């Protein structure tokens, strides 16, 4: 990384991500945390309490809010970049200047160990790593990166500029949109969990003849599994971020710009609206819906649909304020139970005395 403060401003000011710059036009060689910053670094501050630490460590530049920027004075010794949304600004700056270059590989552009079916047209700018297997009639968009041991089965489609990290499997006929990132070991389109039983309760597999559709700009974490539909499609819509170790059952539909944290498990045909946030270990029964802009907290367990946006927690899931009141009582349950038993006994004795 080697970029000046003025270059960052020039790149991001037109879209309003960074609004101003005061101080010197410093050269930045690294984006660093406050506790580890040094000369040449860019740090970000979203709380005034960190200003003193930054001044003491003397990085090249700081990215902060208009209010905090005022604490550095009109002619600061270090460069100050001003952004209305500091967290968003640092994310996009790191993407532009400090992200891993997945196209910079030590292998040939197409590794000789890759197995590619003759029907596949490989774009001139695609990167295909060691041990990759690509089945018949697969469609690859421009600029795709397929790292070591990726498997793409027959008829699947991978959109432009999508990156598949090592060990990703995209199963038959599944579709991945443009600009997606699939992290190591995730499996898209394995058969869903569907069985029929006879009178003796013997199990019979139900073939899943649907597929998975992942729309554009979706990020899927390591070892996440998304099952193909029994019929039709399991769908993850654009802009959604999925953490590691998440499981989506057959025919689940996730709306745009959702966030699913680790260990979330959604049963078949669950429907999430737009911008739903599911924190760690959220779970649902099948065939329920969750309204746009809902937030699911504290191992939320949903056994019924959520029709109104809001914050919900616990299992069975309940409105957050109700959940917090109930949790406050939990440590006193034994005491309350003991007092109730004594009260019942006293009432019974009063009745006998009459």
Swiss-Prot record:
Transmembrane segments: none annotated. Its EC number is 2.3.1.191. InterPro entries: Hexapep, Hexapep_transf_CS, LpxD, Trimer_LpxA-like_sf, UDP_GlcNAc_AcTrfase_non-rep. Keywords: Acyltransferase, Lipid A biosynthesis, Lipid biosynthesis, Lipid metabolism, Repeat, Transferase. The keyword Lipid metabolism applies. GO terms for biological process: lipid A biosynthetic process. The active site is at residue 250. CDD domains: LbH_LpxD (cd03352). Pathway: Bacterial outer membrane biogenesis; LPS lipid A biosynthesis. One of its GO terms (cellular component) is membrane. It catalyses: a UDP-3-O-[(3R)-3-hydroxyacyl]-alpha-D-glucosamine + a (3R)-hydroxyacyl-[ACP] = a UDP-2-N,3-O-bis[(3R)-3-hydroxyacyl]-alpha-D-glucosamine + holo-[ACP] + H(+). One of its GO terms (molecular function) is N-acyltransferase activity. Signal peptide: none annotated. Catalyzes the N-acylation of UDP-3-O-acylglucosamine using 3-hydroxyacyl-ACP as the acyl donor. Is involved in the biosynthesis of lipid A, a phosphorylated glycolipid that anchors the lipopolysaccharide to the outer membrane of the cell. Homotrimer. Belongs to the transferase hexapeptide repeat family. LpxD subfamily. This is UDP-3-O-acylglucosamine N-acyltransferase. The lineage of its organism: Bacteria, Pseudomonadati, Pseudomonadota, Gammaproteobacteria, Methylococcales. The gene is lpxD.
């Amino acid at each position: 990384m080697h970029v000046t403060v003025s270059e960052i401003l020039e790149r991001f000011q037109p879209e309003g991500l960074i609004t101003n710059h005061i101080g010197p036009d410093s050269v930045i060689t690294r984006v660093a945390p406050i506790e580890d910053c040094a000369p040449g670094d860019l740090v970000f501050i979203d709380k005034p309490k960190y200003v003193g630490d930054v001044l003491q460590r003397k990085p090249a530049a700081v990215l902060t809010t208009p209010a905090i920027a005022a604490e550095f004075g009109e002619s600061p010794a270090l460069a100050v970049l001003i952004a209305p949304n500091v967290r968003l600004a640092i994310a996009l700056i790191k993407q532009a200047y400090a992200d891993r270059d997945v196209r910079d590989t030590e292998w040939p552009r197409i590794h000789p160990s890759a197995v590619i079916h003759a029907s596949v047209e490989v774009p001139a700018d695609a990167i295909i790593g060691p041990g990759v297997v690509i089945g018949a009639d697969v469609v690859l968009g421009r600029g795709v990166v397929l790292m070591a041991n990726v498997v793409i089965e027959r008829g699947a489609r991978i959109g432009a500029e999508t990156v598949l990290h090592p060990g990703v499997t995209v199963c038959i006929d599944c579709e991945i949109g443009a600009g997606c990132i699939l992290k190591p070991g995730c499996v898209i389109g394995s058969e869903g969990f569907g069985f029929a039983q006879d009178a003796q309760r013997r199990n019979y597999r139900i073939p899943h003849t649907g597929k998975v559709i992942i729309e554009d700009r979706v990020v899927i974490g390591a070892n996440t599994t998304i099952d193909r539909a029994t019929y039709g499609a399991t769908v993850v819509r654009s802009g959604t971020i999925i953490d590691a170790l998440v499981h989506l059952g057959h025919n689940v539909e996730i709306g745009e710009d959702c966030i699913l944290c680790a260990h979330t498990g959604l049963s078949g045909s669950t429907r999430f609206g737009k911008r739903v946030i599911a924190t760690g270990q959220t779970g649902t029964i099948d065939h329920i819906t969750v309204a746009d802009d809902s937030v699911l907290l504290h191992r939320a367990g949903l056994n019924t649909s959520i029709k109104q946006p809001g914050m919900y927690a616990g299992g069975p899931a309940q409105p957050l304020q109700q959940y917090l009141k109930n949790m406050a009582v939990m440590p006193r349950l034994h005491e309350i139970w003991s007092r109730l038993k004594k009260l019942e006994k006293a009432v019974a004795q009063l009745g006998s005395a009459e």
